[in-house]
Amino acid sequence: MIKWPQKVQESAHQTALPWQEALSIPLLTCLTEQEQSKLVTLAERFLQQKRLVPLQGFELDSLRSCRIALLFCLPVLELGLEWLDGFHEVLIYPAPFVVDDEWEDDIGLVHNQRIVQSGQSWQQGPIVLNWLDIQDSFDASGFNLIIHEVAHKLDTRNGDRASGVPFIPLREVAGWEHDLHAAMNNIQEEIELVGENAASIDAYAASDPAECFAVLSEYFFSAPELFAPRFPSLWQRFCQFYQQDPLQRLHHANDTDSFSATNVH
């Protein structure tokens, strides 16, 4: 049993938040007790510093708030919560939402269209999410909406716009860009061969470097067994940046489970 921090954010009724239940999602069960305790401490501070805003009738209870906070803090478990500076609100729709999108084509004509979005983030603005896709982020499938949007926030700490290169030492930028573009090309080649729907990694990763970093960050944490062997050099760069090794964590958890099973009488 994990011993939680004494100072826990409490509801209006002074009820302790349900961290133990919040941690029970598959994505977080591989963490050690020490990592889970550290993650809860960060998530507790996250809920103190950020405002979660439910929209369009979405009901936000304490368990949902805890799980949202835990997923936000997983990528910065070793980086620190200050890496999530730059926004103060998380807006949460019940389902994917419609936005007005404006874009300029190659000859300078401006177009407007309404599109359905799962999430959005801006450098100095709120993060916008939807609960249906947040729920789909609880497992180890390679999809994680919150980690995707957090990756964009981490990316923009390195400049005015997301580039696919987070804040890393300058001497490592060229190697990062080389490995990231190699991964994009590899994913694009698979798409051309088998089609977007049959591709083993989300085709969105091939659209541009910023999306490649965000999508592969999802796989880094929730499907490391797909990412690591396919892009080993880039995997090591992600491990150095996030200061975590989810594949090693997964193997350790599996070994522990196997040992426990063999010692059951």
UniProtKB/Swiss-Prot annotation:
Its cofactor is Zn(2+). GO terms for molecular function: aminopeptidase activity; metallopeptidase activity; zinc ion binding. The keyword Metal-binding applies. GO terms for cellular component: cytosol. It comes from the Bacteria. GO terms for biological process: proteolysis. The keyword Nucleotide-binding does not apply. It is found in: Cytoplasm. Its EC number is 3.4.11.-. InterPro entries: MetalloPept_cat_dom_sf (IPR024079), MtfA_enterob (IPR057256), MtfA_fam (IPR010384), MtfA_N (IPR042252). Zn(2+) binds at H111, H148, H152, E211. Keywords: Aminopeptidase, Cytoplasm, Hydrolase, Metal-binding, Metalloprotease, Protease, Zinc. It is an enzyme of class 3 (hydrolase). Binds 1 zinc ion per subunit. Gene3D superfamilies: Collagenase (Catalytic Domain), Glucose-regulated metallo-peptidase M90, N-terminal domain. Its main location: cytoplasm. It holds the Pfam family Peptidase_M90. Involved in the modulation of the activity of the glucose-phosphotransferase system (glucose-PTS). Interacts with the transcriptional repressor Mlc, preventing its interaction with DNA and leading to the modulation of expression of genes regulated by Mlc, including ptsG, which encodes the PTS system glucose-specific EIICB component. Shows zinc-dependent metallopeptidase activity. Interacts with Mlc. Belongs to the MtfA family. This is Mlc titration factor A. It comes from Shigella dysenteriae serotype 1 (strain Sd197).
